[in-house]
């Protein structure tokens, strides 16, 4: 049986825990590098992104205006079709004696034609909106890609000096020689 003194005595020989703590070396943790990169991204990317979004907004608004005009044209045609339907109905009342079935066929044909026209216009409007949206998305992607390439090229050109350039060429030449020696 183990008593209380044996238990406390055995705890006295355990080494204290070590190795836990915070790294206070700012250069070792890359906080400065990370903050500089984030600052540069925010500073340069903000203007480009807002310009792209403004352009996209204008394109969407113009597409919506075009779609609304198409919709107004469709409603005008629908009103004309309804007016014609009213005329047909009035004529149907006048010649009801001569053939009720003929009148019904004309009425159905007119309604079907109006519905088909409206559906075609609605489909055309939806296709136009989808096409314009996709085109705008593609343009935004292209603009972002071009801008990123320009910035990357500018960064490379600003950081590439003669010494670094010569070291890179020497390194590549030595790699080619090593490859040539291994193939021989």
Swiss-Prot record:
GO CC annotation: chloroplast thylakoid membrane; proton-transporting ATP synthase complex
Coiled coil location: none
Intracellular or extracellular location(s): Plastid, Chloroplast thylakoid membrane
Keywords: ATP synthesis, CF(0), Chloroplast, Hydrogen ion transport, Ion transport, Membrane, Plastid, Thylakoid, Transmembrane, Transmembrane helix, Transport
Membrane topology value: Single-pass membrane protein
Short name of one Pfam family: ATP-synt_B
Entry keyword Thylakoid: yes
GO MF annotation, one: proton-transporting ATP synthase activity, rotational mechanism
Transmembrane segments: 31-53
InterPro entries cross-referenced by the UniProt entry: ATP_synth_b/b'su_bac/chlpt
Chief location category: plastid
Family (UniProt): Belongs to the ATPase B chain family.
Function: F(1)F(0) ATP synthase produces ATP from ADP in the presence of a proton or sodium gradient. F-type ATPases consist of two structural domains, F(1) containing the extramembraneous catalytic core and F(0) containing the membrane proton channel, linked together by a central stalk and a peripheral stalk. During catalysis, ATP synthesis in the catalytic domain of F(1) is coupled via a rotary mechanism of the central stalk subunits to proton translocation.
The protein's assembly and partners: F-type ATPases have 2 components, F(1) - the catalytic core - and F(0) - the membrane proton channel. F(1) has five subunits: alpha(3), beta(3), gamma(1), delta(1), epsilon(1). F(0) has four main subunits: a(1), b(1), b'(1) and c(10-14). The alpha and beta chains form an alternating ring which encloses part of the gamma chain. F(1) is attached to F(0) by a central stalk formed by the gamma and epsilon chains, while a peripheral stalk is formed by the delta, b and b' chains.
General remark: In plastids the F-type ATPase is also known as CF(1)CF(0).
Name the record gives this protein: ATP synthase subunit b, chloroplastic
Organism: Cycas taitungensis
């Amino acid at each position: 049986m183990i008593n209380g003194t044996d238990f406390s005595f055995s705890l006295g020989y355990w080494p204290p825990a070590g190795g836990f703590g915070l790294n206070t070396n700012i250069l070792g943790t890359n906080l400065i590098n990370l903050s500089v990169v984030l600052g540069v991204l925010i500073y340069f990317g903000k203007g480009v992104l807002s310009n792209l979004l403004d352009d996209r907004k204008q394109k969407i608004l113009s597409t919506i205006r075009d779609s609304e005009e198409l919709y107004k044209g469709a409603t005008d045609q629908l009103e004309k079709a309804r007016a014609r339907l009213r005329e047909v109905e009035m004529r149907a009342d006048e010649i009801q004696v001569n053939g009720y079935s003929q009148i019904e066929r004309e009425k159905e044909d007119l309604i079907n034609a109006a519905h088909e026209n409206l559906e075609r216009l609605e489909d055309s409007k939806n296709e136009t909106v989808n096409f314009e949206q996709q085109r705008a998305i593609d343009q935004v992607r292209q603009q972002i890609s071009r801008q990123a390439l320009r910035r990357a090229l500018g960064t490379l050109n600003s950081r590439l000096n003669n010494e670094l350039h010569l070291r890179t060429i020497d390194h590549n030449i030595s790699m080619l020689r090593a490859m040539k020696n291994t193939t021989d």
